[in-house]
Amino acid sequence: MSSGSIIDRDAISAAFDALDAALDGVAALGFDGLTPRECLALLTHCERLRRRLPAIEHPLINHVARQASPAELGGRLSHAVAEATLISRAEAARRVHTAADLGPRVGLTGEPIAPAPAATAAAQREGLLSPEQVAVIRKFCHQLPGWIDQATRERAETDLAREGTRYRPEQLAALAGTLDDCLNLDGLYRDEDQPAAAG
């Protein structure tokens, strides 16, 4: 084991300890003297921080997926995540699938690969998209028919990621539906697209 690994582990541990300490400090604050407008501004800040957490989880989940076999984990990755974090298996599976899409990936020869929905991943890292908004964009991307070219896919995903910073999830879902109708005017899917189109 190299000393670099120990230093990295120490830095990671210290960063998480600092995050814990910062949250403890904020949780101990009193907010009684604030105006409603100030409280809403702080709630907006809380939401942005909450939205950034998955960007920390994605590389951890993807690393476990690469490094540990189901035998080592005692089952599926989603089950191991559920047991470790005490969340439901359904939520763990959602996080594993989202991490596979939005987290950093590694190619066969070890080279880093950017997330497929790059704009969505970047907006999530900045705390600009909620998990619900991310789910809308991921669903849209997965349901696009195979005949739509990559440049159009990327442009559509970028547009939805940008609009997701301005609209609530249900509004974004309506926009995604309209965009899907524009891209697939006839609603035609090839045979291989049918499972994706069905959801």
Whereabouts are the PLM-identified features?
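Conserved C-terminal region and hinge/linker of Rieske [2Fe-2S] proteins, especially
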Residues: 1-199
